[in-house]
Swiss-Prot record:
Originating gene: uxaB
GO MF term set: mannitol-1-phosphate 5-dehydrogenase activity; tagaturonate reductase activity
Cystines in this chain: none
Domain of life: Bacteria
Species whose genome carries this gene: Escherichia coli (strain K12)
Full protein name: Altronate oxidoreductase
Length: 483
């Protein structure tokens, strides 16, 4: 069986206009996949040079396959049908290592056609590293490497204002573009680079903050033989991902034209502020996960897919989203409903086995950041507690007993909560405290909740009633009236 290469698999090759820091699965099934579609359907005509930003020889370089690899996108489409779509990606030209090919790395700045910089160097990548120097070949941190590359471009083109870059980080931190820009400016000042360079950074370059959303499941280890048989070639860089994707970029409106988004519709939004989109994702996608997990798991289910195929649990989650979360969010209702519909479709994806216990990690913090704001906003707006979000809190407290149908399961959270719950549930079993007292102790933890939740009218009583119902009847019976 042949391995992918451009001689045996000839096709389009595009001029290099994009630098990408990061060779991982996510960017290859997200950014490079989108660039490939735009290259095929528009005159974007842009090839990617992947820069491996860390010193590692594993996985091997994409250049061993001349930059070619296959994405397999699978999940439920807009009609709810299971689809699997294989695509040979031709947008990547080559990969270079910043450690073993430093001169080649700097030469990227000399190419007048270069226009975009994408990156995903993990959440820790956009950070300051104290020892980084201008003459390091290379510096350790990604922002320092980028500063050096930008200075190379500034010098080579004598500060020409039409030679700046559009820099689009995809790292999962808030306002990643702003954070990256601040670090680049910090290195420029620390290295005493000329004032003209600092002005050029601001005038000629755009640092765009982003929100990225796609579950990328990566190399399909267990299915490789079968998939390669179907494809008819060997591909060491096979990459799998879900059908859904969303790319929100906070940047100049002209970006839509530059990326040719006006000529081919991708799920990419160019916006003035990513904040409402971030809030939407946290409240609907992450919030639904967090409400679902303790309810579904204690109802005897193990994966998100099983939960969504269970009529009652699915109804509980959908009613929580549409009746309790969406009404208190600050974006047009139709936009929120269309996003919510995509979310529930993603939860049903038959190709992804998402274990409830793995999502349960750090459940107390997740409840505070993802559900509590909507619970409190609903109470404030209507004068009554949202029934399902309140029930989810009771289910969460019950979850920390660590026992289902007589069998124990691992609960992962910080030591404070694990010890606290062990003590509280032990006292409850010994009848030292009642359910209402247990709930009041949990809700009074100001250090965690950032407020005293026992002061929210009716919350302790409602959570205690729900918790008693769960303990007496079991989760199935207790949740039924809310389905």
């Amino acid at each position: 069986m042949k391995t992918l290469n451009r001689r045996d698999f000839p096709g389009a090759q595009y001029p290099e206009r994009i630098i990408q820091f990061g060779e991982g699965n996510f960017l290859r099934a997200f950014v490079d996949w989108q660039i490939d579609l735009l290259n095929e359907h528009t005159d974007l005509n842009s090839g990617v040079v992947v820069v491996r930003p860390i010193e590692t020889s594993f996985p091997p370089s994409l250049s061993t396959q001349d930059g070619l690899y296959t994405t397999i996108i699978r999940g439920l489409n807009e009609k709810g049908e299971a689809v699997s779509d294989a695509r040979l990606i031709r947008s990547v030209n080559r990969e270079i290592s910043v450690y073993s090919e430093y001169d080649e790395f700097l030469k990227l700045a000399h190419n007048p056609e270069m226009r975009f910089v994408f990156s995903n160097t993990t959440e820790a990548g956009i950070s300051y590293h104290a020892g980084d120097k201008f003459d390091d070949a290379p510096a350790v941190s990604y922002p320092a490497k980028l500063t050096r590359l930008l200075f190379e471009r500034f010098s080579h083109f004598n500060g020409a204002l039409d030679k700046g870059w559009i820099i689009i980080p995809c790292e999962l931190i808030d306002y990643n573009g702003d954070a990256l820009r601040e670090l680049v400016l910090r290195y420029a000042q620390e290295w005493a680079l000329p004032e003209a360079f600092i002005q050029w950074l601001d005038q000629a370059n755009s640092f765009c903050s982003t929100l990225v959303d796609r579950i990328v499941t990566g190399y399909p280890r267990d299915e490789v033989a079968k998939l390669e048989e179907e494809l008819g070639y060997h591909d060491g860089f096979l990459d799998t991902a879900e059908h859904f994707y969303l790319f929100v970029i906070q940047g100049p409106k002209s970006l839509a034209t530059e990326l040719r988004l006006d000529k081919y519709p991708l799920n990419v939004l160019i916006v003035d502020d990513i904040k409402p989109y971030k809030e939407r994702k946290v409240a609907i996608l992450n919030g639904a996960h967090t409400a679902l997990v303790p309810v579904a798991f204690q109802a005897g289910l193990d994966t998100v897919g099983e939960a969504m195929n269970d009529a009652e649990i699915c109804a509980f989650v959908e009613k929580a989203i549409y009746e309790e979360i969406i009404p208190v969010l600050d974006l047009p209702r139709d936009e929120l409903e269309s996003f919510a519909s995509a979310v529930t479709g993603r939860f049903r994806n038959p190709y992804i086995k998402h274990q409830l216990l793995s999502i349960a990690l750090n459940g107390m913090t997740k409840f505070r950041t993802r559900i509590l704001p909507q619970l409190l906003a609903g109470q404030k707006a209507n004068g009554t507690l949202p029934a399902r979000l309140t029930f989810a809190l009771a289910a969460l407290i019950a979850f920390y007993r660590g026992e289902r149908n007589g069998e124990t399961y691992p609960v992962q959270d910080d030591a404070h909560w694990l010890e606290r719950y062990q003590q509280l549930w032990s006292q409850h079993r010994d009848r030292v405290i009642g359910t209402q007292e247990l709930v009041a102790i949990v809700l009074a933890e100001k250090d965690h909740w950032e407020q005293d939740l026992t002061q929210v009218p009716g919350l302790v009583e409602q959570v205690a009633n729900d918790l008693d119902a769960i303990l007496e009847k079991g989760m199935r019976e207790a949740v039924r009236p809310l389905c």
